A protein has these predicted regions:
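Substrate-gating cap/lid region and adjacent catalytic-acid/histidine neighborhood
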Residues: 265, 274-461, 474
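Short Gly/aromatic-enriched secondary-structure transition segments
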Residues: 21, 25-49, 342-362, 489-495
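Non-transmembrane alpha-helical segments in soluble domains
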Residues: 105, 134-137, 163-166, 170, ...
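Serine-hydrolase-like catalytic core of hydrolytic proteins
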Residues: 28, 70-263, 285, 317-340
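Surface-exposed helix-capping loop/turn segments at secondary-structure junctions
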Residues: 97-101, 173-182, 260-261, 405-413, ...
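Mature extracytoplasmic/periplasmic domains
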Residues: 485-509
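Non-catalytic accessory segments of hydrolases
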Residues: 1-156, 216, 297, 449-485, ...
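A structural signal for the main folded, soluble domain(s) of proteins
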Residues: 65-80, 122-124, 130, 154-155, ...
C-alpha cells in the first residue's frame, strides 16, 4: 500500500513532500525571497510565510544561466518550467520524519560559479538518505546575479545565499529528523571553492559599507561560522578575484549586453540578457590581456576578496587560524584538467606553443616552466599543458588548503581519486567531476542524460560503482563523527587516501607538483593594468 504524501510544518508554513524509493523527499522549498525587483543584486531576505499547504514535489528553478558543460541537457533559466525568479530554494531527503539527531549533509553544486542546478539528476539525495543522512541540496545565484561586481551592491551574493541556506538548515532541519548541531557542507569544483570561502567568512570583514548599500541590518548576514561543523571540499579551484578584476569582468559583460555597468542599468536588464552576454564574453576571454592568467580559463566569475563579505583568501585565512575548529576533508582527482581538453576537442592537438603559453602563465617561481620540463622528462606538450593547468586550477589549491588547515591546528584529511572514468574508452582518466557520480551513484534508469552518462558511460563496471559506494560511506562516516577511516593529514607524514582499484593509503603521491609549488602562495588574482 502506497504511503500518503507526507506533510510537515517548518517556520514559514506547512509542506507536502513525497515518499519515494524508501525515503522522504521535499523539493523547491524557499530559503529566501526571490531576488528580483527591489531585491535584485541585494543580500538575501528571509522567505515569506505562506498559508495552507505548499507542495514540495518539484525542484525550484536555478538562476538564469547559459548552458554549461555539466548536465548540458538540464532545463536552465527561463527554460525551466515555472521560472518566476524563485531561484533560492533547498531540497531535502530524509530517511525518517519521526527521527531526531540524524547527521545533516548540505551539498553545494559546482559549475564555474556560472551554471548548475540542484535539479541535476546526479544530485539525487536518495542514496545518502537511505544510509541514515538528512541530505540537503540548494540553488544559489550564479554569474552576474551572484558574483558580478556591481556598484552599490554587496559582493559575493552567491556566497551570501549559501549562508542564508545554512541558516535555513539551522532553523528548520529538526523537522526533517536532522541535527542542526551536526551539519557537514560538501561540494565539488565551484562548490568546493564556495566552501573554502565559507571557511573564511567568520564575520570579521568590514561589512558597514555593504550593509549601508544593501539596507541589511541582520546580525551575521556575512558570517558562516557556527552554521556547520565539518566541511568536505572536492577539487578546490584556485581562482579568487580582487574587486578591480571582478568589476572589470562585469563591465565587459555589461558592454556586451549593451547596458552601462551601473546598478540601475544592470538591475533593469533581463537576467537572460546578462547570462547570454556572459557566455559570449567567456568564449573570447583570451582577448582580455588585462585579466592576466584568468584569460586562459573559461571562468569569468569567482568569489571576490572584498574585505566585507569575504575578508581574506581562504588559504591565508586558514593559515591564520580561521575555521580551526572545523574538521576538513579535502582532495582532488589525478587528471583534473583532462575533462576540459577532451570537451574542447583538443586531445592530441596541443602544440608546443600551447604548452609554452600555459607554462609561462602558470608555472610558479623559482623554477618556472623549466621545473615542469625537468620534473617530467619526455612529457609531450599535451601532457605538460594538462599537468600545469591541473595543478594551478585544482590540485595545488586543494593541497595548499589542506596544508594551511593542518599547520594552524585544524583536523584535516586528504584524498586523491585515481580510478579512471570508463566513458569514451577511458581517455578521460581520473578527470575533473568524476567524484560526483561516484559519490551520488548512477541515476535511476530513464533519467535524462547528464554528467553521469558523460563520465561513467552507459554501463560502468561494478568495481567502479563499489568504489563510489566506499567513498560515499567514508563521506558519511566523516559527517557522522569526523572520522572517514584513515589518519589525518600532517606536513610530516602527508597521509592521503587513494581512491583507486584497489584503494590504498599513501604519502601524498604528486611529489613533483608539491615540490614545484611549495613556495607559491595562493591568494587573489589581480587586474594586470
Amino acid at each position: 500500500m502506497a504511503l500518503a504524501d507526507p506533510e510537515i510544518v517548518i517556520g514559514p508554513g506547512r509542506l507536502r513532500g513525497r515518499y519515494e524509493s524508501g525515503v522522504f523527499a521535499f523539493r523547491g522549498i524557499p530559503y529566501a525571497k526571490p531576488p528580483l525587483g527591489e531585491l535584485r543584486f541585494m543580500s538575501p531576505e528571509p522567505p515569506a510565510a505562506w498559508d495552507g499547504v505548499r507542495d514540495a514535489g518539484a525542484f525550484g528553478p536555478p538562476a538564469e544561466q547559459p548552458p554549461g558543460l555539466s548536465g548540458a541537457t538540464a532545463p536552465r533559466g527561463n527554460a525551466f518550467p515555472g521560472n518566476s525568479g524563485e531561484w533560492l530554494t533547498v531540497n531535502v531527503w530524509t530517511p525518517d520524519l519521526g527521527a531526531s539527531g540524524l547527521p545533516v549533509m548540505v551539498w553545494i553544486h559546482g559549475g564555474a560559479y556560472m551554471f548548475g542546478s540542484s535539479a541535476e539528476p546526479v544530485y539525487d539525495g536518495g542514496r545518502f538518505a537511505m544510509a541514515g543522512v538528512v541530505l540537503v541540496t540548494c540553488n544559489y545565484r550564479l554569474g552576474v546575479e551572484g558574483f558580478g561586481q556591481i556598484p552599490g551592491a554587496p559582493a559575493n551574493r552567491g556566497l551570501l545565499d549559501l549562508v542564508a541556506a545554512l541558516r535555513w538548515v539551522a532553523e528548520n532541519i529538526e523537522a526533517f529528523g536532522g541535527d542542526p548541531g551536526n551539519v557537514t557542507v560538501f561540494g565539488e569544483s565551484a562548490g568546493a571553492g564556495a566552501i573554502a570561502a565559507l571557511l573564511a567568512m567568520d564575520g570579521s570583514g568590514d561589512g558597514e559599507a555593504a550593509e549601508s548599500a544593501t539596507g541589511s541590518n541582520s546580525a551575521g548576514w556575512n558570517d558562516a561560522s557556527g552554521l556547520f561543523r565539518r566541511a568536505i571540499a572536492e577539487s578546490v579551484p584556485g581562482t579568487f578575484f580582487t574587486p578591480r578584476l571582478a568589476a572589470d569582468v562585469t563591465s565587459a559583460i555589461a558592454e556586451e549586453a549593451g547596458v552601462p555597468p551601473t546598478y540601475e542599468a544592470l538591475a533593469a536588464a533581463d537576467p537572460a540578457l546578462l547570462a547570454a552576454a556572459s557566455a559570449r564574453v567567456t568564449a573570447r576571454m583570451r582577448e582580455f590581456g588585462r585579466w592576466g592568467a584568468v584569460r586562459l580559463t573559461d571562468t569569468p566569475f569567482s568569489p571576490v576578496v572584498d574585505g566585507a563579505v569575504l575578508p581574506r583568501a581562504p588559504w591565508r585565512a586558514l593559515l591564520a587560524g580561521a575555521a580551526r575548529d572545523i574538521e576538513l576533508l579535502t582532495g582532488h582527482n589525478r587528471d583534473e584538467y583532462r575533462l576540459f581538453i577532451v570537451a574542447s576537442g583538443r586531445l592530441g592537438k596541443i602544440t608546443e606553443e600551447d604548452a609554452a603559453t600555459v607554462l609561462d602563465a602558470f608555472a610558479p617561481a623559482p623554477d618556472g616552466p623549466a621545473g615542469y620540463r625537468n620534473g617530467h622528462p619526455g612529457a609531450s606538450p599535451g601532457r605538460l599543458f594538462e599537468l600545469v593547468f591541473s595543478d594551478w586550477l585544482f590540485r595545488m589549491p586543494t593541497l595548499h588548503l589542506a596544508q594551511a588547515h593542518a599547520v594552524s591546528g585544524g583536523t584535516t584529511y586528504l584524498y586523491e581519486l585515481r580510478a579512471e572514468a570508463p566513458a569514451l574508452d577511458g581517455v578521460l582518466g581520473a578527470c575533473h567531476g568524476l567524484d560526483v557520480p561516484l559519490l551520488f551513484g548512477p541515476p535511476a534508469p530513464g533519467t535524462r542524460p547528464g554528467i553521469s552518462d558523460m563520465l561513467l558511460g552507459g554501463s560502468p563496471p561494478a568495481s567502479l560503482i563499489a568504489l563510489g559506494d566506499q567513498m560515499r560511506g567514508d563521506w558519511i562516516r566523516f559527517a557522522t563523527d569526523g572520522d572517514p577511516g584513515w589518519s589525518p593529514y600532517g606536513t610530516e607524514h602527508r597521509t592521503t587516501r587513494i581512491y583507486d582499484m584497489p584503494p590504498d593509503v599513501l604519502s601524498y603521491p604528486e611529489e613533483t607538483s608539491m615540490r614545484l609549488w611549495q613556495r607559491h602562495r595562493f591568494g587573489v588574482l589581480e587586474l594586470s593594468c
